């Protein structure tokens, strides 16, 4: 009876929490072994109940097809439905709340396009699989089924979902990017609207060779993130980032893709690729090989006004062609010891041989009177050999500490020989030969740590880049002369980014420090005036939240834009007897401040950015040496420029038709010296895109895309309007193993943009008359399809781009 009474009293204490103790149980207080045993068991039950109050809460969110859903909002609630904390699912649909939450009772799961769910939290904290069903709305007798938006916001990124959308059938990553909002261009030549050329990543590895985009099948892509205001963990010169994430790899064995593309513009060219992989266990071996060959055509007209003691007008018409042969190869491996540790390395090489020739005529007027007529012929041979590039990486986790290390080495040599023959009606004829040899090499490494911290996480790391660019130029043109220059640069950087969640708000703070030592040498002698050392801090700040169905994000960054090595190259190239072209070793880096706002609601999204640039680098002209009649086209720092840019878009689905509409505008505030006064270059540039995907019978996809861009000012240039109409048919066979793509791009040949460069003494009008109408046929065969495990992120890619 005594034992039973002890059990009842102890059980009541457990149920009310009074039996919870933090000190070890003293069994001496019990009068019998039975009571001691019973008391110990009840103590352990109470201890387990106490631990349950501090458990982690986890779960996984999937759609009706059991596919993981990322970017889903998960809110932790008390019994009275008051808010405790919030989280977002990762790429695998998983969410987790750490220990120590305040008496949680429910989780509420919500995502645009899906029905919300509120679920009880089990004692273990493991909720398991949560299935979200598409939201349906009854309108009269019609049921409208909502779809998950293709584009959404995650933190400071605009995320476009590829998996499960029509973009899966686009073809390659190149084709996907042409359909991503804010991304302009094609075939590896991409830019982000208002932000210039982006750094592109695939699974966290920075893309060093843009041909990799054509090697990645669209069906293997999960989503694409566009970051228009990247933070401290990116190089201070990176103004936009595109991150491509693929689906998880599956299966072992040998796999590959064979791809052949024929392109007909004015001349024919071909792009052929073969990619192979062998996978067993955690080991993956891969090799990629490719060839690009054919002939390219270009034609343009240039009108140049030069104001000196004599007003010179030059009217130049030029037609040219280039034949290219490029081979490239890449081989490497990756090994996953387990889900927490992987290593890998690759080596790539290739060579490019290009032969070009051009013919032209030029009419020269002096003070409006005929002065001379020139006939010009030129040819050049450009060879790049070798193009060494190697990468080594380690990616792992030690407990909750994430580690990512990358090292890159690059070395290449370029040789360019030129011949120019000018025949004059009234002056001496000119015959110029030149030979330029440039060498570039780079060693870079990057180490990044990540760790959970307080209400979020912290990332910190360092980056080191050592680079050299040398140029030797020899010519028999007495006006220019020979040149021998070299640039050495060392960049050491450290950065930290902290992300925290406070209720419905996500806050990110970052800081990057860069020490750059720049040395410029001519004929082996260091030029002190042109050699610089920079020590800079680059802060960043971001804030994001979700109010009902509206996603909002705001960010600030401080960036820089360092001149490319070509911009710094003191070599002067001969164009014609009145015009030379060269770099400027005295250039300073730009200083850039940007504030950005982003928002998304259902299928609509918008973005706006204000940018202030100090010492912007732009084209300009100066008299060359003591000859005021000869002008040098070069680069220079201007005082300042301000930009305002906005972009809005929406996507819809009407039966088999999936249209997307995007509208953007860029406006700058810039005043320059022009002629005898000042000139404002403030005209905005507008953009309109109308993209259509139609799912035809027999699983055929038809894409019809239209774009129009207005005239306006960009830096000290005035650009004319342009437009294009593209159409594409895509059909896959044999369970997507074989596909055929037919494309017609720029059907009406209206995509050329004419530009006018405005300077104090020289105005250059360039009219691009190249035929851009292109027809393409692509055949692709894939066997044993699998996805890349290589996790190297790459280091020093921005230096490679500067080369």
Regions found by a protein language model. Name each.
Residues 442-446, 493, 588, 594, ...:
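Outer membrane beta-barrel strand-and-loop segments of large Gram-negative receptors
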Residues 235-242, 250-300, 324-327:
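Outer-membrane beta-barrel translocator/receptor signature
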Residues 125-131, 141, 173-176, 210-211, ...:
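N-terminal periplasmic accessory domains that precede
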Residues 486-489, 529-532, 560-614, 632-645, ...:
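Outer-membrane beta-barrel signature, preferentially recognizing the C-terminal barrel domain
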């Amino acid at each position: 009876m005594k034992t039973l009474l002890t059990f009842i009293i102890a059980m009541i204490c457990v149920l009310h929490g009074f039996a919870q103790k933090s000190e070890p149980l003293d069994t001496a207080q019990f009068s019998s072994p039975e009571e001691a045993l019973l008391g110990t068991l009840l103590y352990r039950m109470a201890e387990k109940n106490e631990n349950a109050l501090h458990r982690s809460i986890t779960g996984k969110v999937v759609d009706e097809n059991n596919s993981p859903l990322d970017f889903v909002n998960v809110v932790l609630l008390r019994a009275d439905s008051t808010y405790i904390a919030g989280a977002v699912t990762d790429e695998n649909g998983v969410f987790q709340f750490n220990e120590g939450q305040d008496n949680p009772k429910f989780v509420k799961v919500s995502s645009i396009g899906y029905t919300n769910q509120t679920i009880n939290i089990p004692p273990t904290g493991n909720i398991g699989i949560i299935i979200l069903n598409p939201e349906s709305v009854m309108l009269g007798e019609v049921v409208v089924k909502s779809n998950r938006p293709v584009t959404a916001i995650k933190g400071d990124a605009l995320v476009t979902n590829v998996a499960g959308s029509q973009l899966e059938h686009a073809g390659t990553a190149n084709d996907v990017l042409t359909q991503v909002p804010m991304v302009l261009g094609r075939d590896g030549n991409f830019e982000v609207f208002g932000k210039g050329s982006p750094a592109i990543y695939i699974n966290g590895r920075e893309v060093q060779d843009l041909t990799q985009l054509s090697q990645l099948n669209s069906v293997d892509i999960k989503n694409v993130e566009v970051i228009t205001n990247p933070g401290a963990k990116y190089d201070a010169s990176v103004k936009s980032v595109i991150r491509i994430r693929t689906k998880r790899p599956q299966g072992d064995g040998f796999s590959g893709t064979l791809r052949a593309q024929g392109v007909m513009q004015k001349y024919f060219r071909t792009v052929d690729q073969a990619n192979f992989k062998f996978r067993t266990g955690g080991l993956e071996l891969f090799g990629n090989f490719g060839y690009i060959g054919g002939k390219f055509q270009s034609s343009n007209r240039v009108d140049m006004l030069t104001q000196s003691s004599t007003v010179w007008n030059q009217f130049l018409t030029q037609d040219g062609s280039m034949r290219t042969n490029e081979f490239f190869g890449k081989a490497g491996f990756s090994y996953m010891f387990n889900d927490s540790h992987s290593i890998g390395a690759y080596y790539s090489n290739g060579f490019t041989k290009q032969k070009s020739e051009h013919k032209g005529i030029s009419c020269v007027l002096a003070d409006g009177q005929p002065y001379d007529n020139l006939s010009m012929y030129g040819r050049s041979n450009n060879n790049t050999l070798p193009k060494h590039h190697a990468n080594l990486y380690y990616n792992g986790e030690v407990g909750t500490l994430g580690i990512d290390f990358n090292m890159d080495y690059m070395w290449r040599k370029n040789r360019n020989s030129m011949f120019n023959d000018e025949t004059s009606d009234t002056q001496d004829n000119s015959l110029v030969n030149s030979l330029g040899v440039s060498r570039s090499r780079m060693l870079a490494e990057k180490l990044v740590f990540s760790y959970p911290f307080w209400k979020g996480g912290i990332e910190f790391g360092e980056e080191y880049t050592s680079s050299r660019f040398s140029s030797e130029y020899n010519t028999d043109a007495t006006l220019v002369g020979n040149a021998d220059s070299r640039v050495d640069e060392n960049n050491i950087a450290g950065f930290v980014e902290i992300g925290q969640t406070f209720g419905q708000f996500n806050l990110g703070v970052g800081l990057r420090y860069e020490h750059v030592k720049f040395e410029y040498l001519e004929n082996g002698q260091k030029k002190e005036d042109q050699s610089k050392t920079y020590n800079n801090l680059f802060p960043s700040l971001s804030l994001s939240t979700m109010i009902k169905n509206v996603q909002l994000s705001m960010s600030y960054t401080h960036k820089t834009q360092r001149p490319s090595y070509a911009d710094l190259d003191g070599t002067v190239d001969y164009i014609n007897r009145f015009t030379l072209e060269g770099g400027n070793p005295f250039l300073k880096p730009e200083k850039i401040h940007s504030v950005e706002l982003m928002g998304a609601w259902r299928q609509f999204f918008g973005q706006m950015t204000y940018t202030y640039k100090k010492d912007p680098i732009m084209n300009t002209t100066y008299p060359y040496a003591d000859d005021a009649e000869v002008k040098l086209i070069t680069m220079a720092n201007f005082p300042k420029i301000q930009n305002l840019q906005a972009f809005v878009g929406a996507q819809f689905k009407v039966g088999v038709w999936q249209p997307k509409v995007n509208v953007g505008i860029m406006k700058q505030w810039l005043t320059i010296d022009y002629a005898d006064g000042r000139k404002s270059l403030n005209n905005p540039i507008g953009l309109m895109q109308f993209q259509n995907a139609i799912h035809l019978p027999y699983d055929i996809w038809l894409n019809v895309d239209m774009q129009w861009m207005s005239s306006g000012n960009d830096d000290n240039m005035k650009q004319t309007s342009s437009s294009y109409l593209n159409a594409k048919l895509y059909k896959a066979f044999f369970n997507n193993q074989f596909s055929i793509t037919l494309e017609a791009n720029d059907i009406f040949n209206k995509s050329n943009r004419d530009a006018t460069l405005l300077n104090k003494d020289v105005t250059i009008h360039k009219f691009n008359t190249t035929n851009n109408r292109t027809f393409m046929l692509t055949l692709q065969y894939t066997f044993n399809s699998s996805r890349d495990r290589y996790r190297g992120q790459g280091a020093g890619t921005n230096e490679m781009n500067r080369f």
